[in-house]
Amino acid sequence: MKLHFRFWPLAAILLTLASCLEPEDPIQELYSAPSPTQVSNDITWEWSELYLKIERNLAGFRPAPTCRAMAYIHMGAYETVVPGMEQYRSLAQAINGFPTIQFKGDTTRINWAIALNAYYARTFTFFLFNANAAEQSSIEQLEATQLE
């Protein structure tokens, strides 16, 4: 009988202390990337600087094609990040014949800085196809630097 009287106060104290603890949430919060409009423009700026640095030393450099190439490159960069910007629309609505791309993924889980960096690195290899090994290396180096 005495054991009963000692057990109940101890059980009440333990239950009170246990109820004060915050429960652990077994579901971790998912990564939510910031909108592309909240990301710095340093990525675009540095890739543009690299393009102009490489382009001016290439054989057959002419200013007019360089301007056109930069326009195409940046138009593609815009289309890369436009699914993550709610207030902006694709150029397909303004340019006749421009392909419409339906994005079906979750835009909150995409790191837009990485997507834009990958776009520029891949695109530069196509536009600067006659760059020498050192210039190709500088493209790869900038891509790696942007990921840090």
Regions from the PLM with identified roles:
Residues 10-14:
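Hydrophobic helical h-region of N-terminal Sec-dependent signal peptides
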Residues 1-9:
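Bacterial N-terminal signal peptides that target proteins for export
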Residues 21-148:
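Acidic/polar surface patches and capping/hinge elements
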Residues 16-19:
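C-terminal motif of bacterial Sec signal peptides marking the signal peptidase cleavage site
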